[in-house]
Amino acid sequence: MSRKGKAKKRKAERLRNKKLIDRYPWISPVNWHWKRIPSYDFTMYDDVPKGWKRAFGKIMLEEYREALIRCNYLDKFQWIQVKEKYGTLRLYSNAAPKEVSDLESKYDHISGYFCIECGRMNVPVLTGGWVEPLCEGFKRFLREEIK
C-alpha cells in the first residue's frame, strides 16, 4: 500500500473512531490517571477480539449505553482495560452503578461461548494449558499451522 493509501486509511479509521466515541464516550482511550485522551487513533473497543465484536459487540455497546443513560452515568463511566483472560472477555472500568456492573459480568460469562476469532458459538477448548474459546474450524487451522 502506498504512503498516500495508508494516510487515507488512517484518516478513515480516525473518523470511524470519532463516531464511535461520540456515541459511546466510555470507549475513549485513557492515560495512567484514567483521564480521557483527546485522540481518535484508537479506542478501548479496539481491544475487543474480532470474533466477539462480530457475535455481540454492537449489542453490548448499545446495552451499556441504555443502562448508562438510565443511571444518568453516561459521561462518568469509563472502560479502563479490555482484554481476554481465561477464555472470556474482561471489561475493567471505574466505579459504576450495579446495573452497569452486571453487564460486565454478563459479557464475561457469555463471551466464553463464542469463538474469539470468528464469532461462532462454541465450547471453550483447553489447548496446552490455555483456555481458548475457538470453534472447531479455528482449532483445526491452528493445528495445521503448527505442523
Which residues does each predicted region cover?
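Cysteine-rich micro-motifs
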Residues: G129-F141
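A conserved ligand/cofactor-binding region detector
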Residues: K19-D22, I27, Y45-K53, N122
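Short Lys/Arg-rich cationic patches that frequently serve as NLS/NoLS or arginine-rich RNA/DNA-binding motifs
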Residues: M1-K19
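Active-site acidic/histidine clusters and adjacent loop/turn architecture
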Residues: S39-R90
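Short, flexible, mixed-charge glycine/proline-rich loop motifs
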Residues: K83, D102-Y113, P124-G129
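Short cysteine-rich clusters marking metal-coordination/redox-active sites
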Residues: C115-C118, C135
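Short Cys/His-rich Zn2+-coordinating modules
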Residues: L74-K76, N94-E104
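Short functional micro-motifs and their immediate structural scaffolds
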Residues: M121-L126, R140-R143
